[in-house]
Amino acid sequence: MRTSGPVIEIRAACAADASTMAAIHAACFAKSWDAAEIGSFLGVPGCLALLASISPAQAPQGFLIVRSAGDEAELLTLAVDQACRRLGVASALLAAATGALRGAGSKRLFLEVDEGNSAARDLYQSLGAVVVGRRPRYYEHGADADIFSLAL
């Protein structure tokens, strides 16, 4: 008997979510964004911020922020609580975001990934993203960033 995965609820983030998002971001990245930095994207035209919760959890376990301009968009950040990884949270966030971006007229999504982050690379490649460039020594720890492009 096959069981389905968890139910993942996606909703738009608002200013009141900035502290929660900052806490998730801090747990995921050495150079994290604080609530003020995250809040600077919330409610801004051209920015989309989504939160994911595994039902019936009350607190979000992941989020993403994308910014669009013209027919292109950029994934600014995606963070998922470590305890909830590999449960489909990032995939659900990306599916919701790409659907919204498509609906708004975006044709392509760009993002940077640490060359050593194989889980993220695998996820984006599974969605059809391809490497289109590289930013040498992009991260503070000296790693390069691969630039991915995903046709929407």
In which residue ranges do the predicted regions lie?
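Acetyl-CoA-dependent GNAT
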Residues: 2-5, 12-87, 91-104, 151-152
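Conserved catalytic-core motifs of GNAT/GCN5-like acyltransferases
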Residues: 36, 112, 125, 130-146
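Conserved catalytic core of the tyrosine transesterase superfamily
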Residues: 1-2, 47, 108, 114, ...
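Conserved hydrophobic/aromatic "anchor" residues
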Residues: 29, 63, 84, 123, ...
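Residue-level recognition of the GNAT/N-acetyltransferase active site
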Residues: 81, 114-116
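Short glycine/proline-centered loop/turn elements that form peptide/ligand docking sites
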Residues: 94, 117-120, 137-142
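Conserved GNAT acetyl-CoA-binding A-motif
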Residues: 101-112, 135
